[in-house]
C-alpha cells in the first residue's frame, strides 16, 4: 500500500507508553535512578537496532512515549522485558497501541526553531 506516493512499511508501528513502577524512586531525577547507565545503554541499543524510532518523557515525566517498529505487540513486550529497569520493576508498560503512521516530516529535514 502507498500513501502520497510513499510505500508504507510492512512492519507495523506501535505507540508505547511506559510508566513508573513501584521500584521507581520519586525523590530522584531520572538520570539519578538506580541502574540509569544500564537502562540508557539498553534503550540506545534499541534505537541502534531500529526498534525505537522516537521516544522520551511526556507531561510531568511520570510516563514516556515511544514510537516503535516491531513485528507485533508480543515482540514489543518481549524486548522491553529485557530492560534493566523492567526487571527492577522501575518501569512498566502502561499501554501499547498499533499505529498507522501516515505522516512523517522527519525525512524532509524540517527543523523547528
Annotate each PLM feature.
Residues 2-113:
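Conserved, structured core segments of small domains
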